Amino acid sequence: MRLDQVARSLLLKEFVSGFALAMRYLFKPKATINYPFEMGHRSPRFRGEHALRRYPNGEERCIACKLCEAICPAQAITIEAGPRRNDGTRRTTRYDIDMVKCIYCGMCQEACPVDAIVEGPNFEFSVETREELLYDKQKLLANGDRWEREIARNIAADAPYR
């Protein structure tokens, strides 16, 4: 063994440098969040649980154009449109999303011309069975009603970048 190797092993240089590094970070503020008691900041572009939105008068926004169904890469969206109404518009009779298939890419939200389908701020939607992850129109509208204020705020915050 050479002399410098002996000196390093006797003086425990690696141990001392590692210990000094640990001591330096010991007294700094912690970077972790005490979840679920503390919630971290989420971006306005966060993609969580899907929701169908309504207009302020209570009418659903979806016009049954089926662009979200066509663009979905996972083929997780199924839409059936009702007959045209007297004013020429259509509404959906069935709007299903298979959340097991969904990859949360956000393409459905980007394709929607009326901001009807959005990915909301909720990320805590655990279930006990796979069947509960098959969202129908009523579940999606209920999500939209529950999260509308936060969804509208996120869309407004993201509007300059769209």
Curated annotation (Swiss-Prot):
UniProt cross-references to InterPro entries, sorted A to Z: 4Fe4S_Fe-S-bd, 4Fe4S_Fe_S_CS, NADH_quinone_OxRdtase_chainI
Domain 4Fe-4S ferredoxin-type: 52-82, 93-122
GO molecular-function term, one example from the UniProt record: NADH:ubiquinone reductase (non-electrogenic) activity
GO biological process, one term: aerobic respiration
Family: Belongs to the complex I 23 kDa subunit family.
PANTHER family named among the record's database cross-references: NADH DEHYDROGENASE [UBIQUINONE] IRON-SULFUR PROTEIN 8, MITOCHONDRIAL (PTHR10849:SF20), NADH DEHYDROGENASE UBIQUINONE IRON-SULFUR PROTEIN 8, MITOCHONDRIAL (PTHR10849)
Function: NDH-1 shuttles electrons from NADH, via FMN and iron-sulfur (Fe-S) centers, to quinones in the respiratory chain. The immediate electron acceptor for the enzyme in this species is believed to be ubiquinone. Couples the redox reaction to proton translocation (for every two electrons transferred, four hydrogen ions are translocated across the cytoplasmic membrane), and thus conserves the redox energy in a proton gradient.
Protein name (record): NADH-quinone oxidoreductase subunit I
Protein encoded by which gene: nuoI
